[in-house]
Amino acid sequence: MKKNVEIKKLGINGEGIGYIDRKIVFVPGALPQEEVIVEIIKQTRTYSEGKLLQVVKPSKDRVTPKCRSYDNCQGCTMLHLSYFKQLNAKKEAVRESIRKYTEYDLSRTIFKDVIAAPSQEGFITAVNLPIVDFKGKISFGIYQRDSKYLTLMTRCFKQHPIINECLLKLEEILTTNKCKTYSDKFRTGLRFLKVKLIDNKLQLVFITGRDWLKEEIVKEISQLPHVASIFMSVNTSKHQEFDELGYSKLYGATRLELHDDKNQYLVSVKSKLPENIEMMWKQNQTIKSSVQDSQKIISLNCGIGLLELNLDQEIVAIDEKRYQIDDAKLNAK
């Protein structure tokens, strides 16, 4: 069933919101002030979902996404909206979430503008990707929600170029060596790849079945540019909490060094880093300026102490993961 819909606002997940016969309809890919033609693909008693077929009257804020897979990939939801309008939308999403899910009085809070990122391209420095078989080639990609569509992640414009270059080289090495992707039946093969880029050095973690990675393949990977360490973990369970079983080091440094203007931090294979390191430093400076009048601070989910070690006050730092605390203690020395 096709319908004309006028989009009134954005939802908290970036989808356009309009109304048909006073019932709300969610339209991914549509923007406020747009008139669109949609196909209704789902109806419930309280709402409908529409697939965007045509933009009859486009918004002045609509832009052409740089991602070549944007129409099918669901990893990003607002690339068709100009960047600074995205920031406004994110601020409103926070306000709307607080209004909808809490009893907090919004009139008591001033919502400041979202701080823009230094770069909108090449900023992702940590990725976790399934290892997939695509047209007879080993690659790295993600399957989209509620579909069998595969998005290859070897050329994602948001990922740092060093990561993309490494993924392409790994494709070549793993395919040439006739590696296999994971088989639930036999519990063998390559399952996941975790990559961290820290000060232009790569930490690679392979999650495999019972057959591990061959020594000659590890040696070939170790010779790639920027590769500083390689780890592996055998995991044949259904869940994806790989940290619990630990990792075996196959090559290189046990910990990598991360630097800011004043300090050096050690990062182990288990420790988590934000995907946008540049933005994290900016965030830390904002938080530091906001707590200047505080004498004692409790920090929950402190990680390895990247924020806490830059604060001047007395800090009580808490994290549920022991390995995060171990790294934080090393960094505090």
Across the structure, where does each feature detected by a protein language model lie?
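A short glycine-rich, hydrophobically flanked beta-strand micro-motif that places a catalytic Asp/Glu
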Residues: Y182-L197
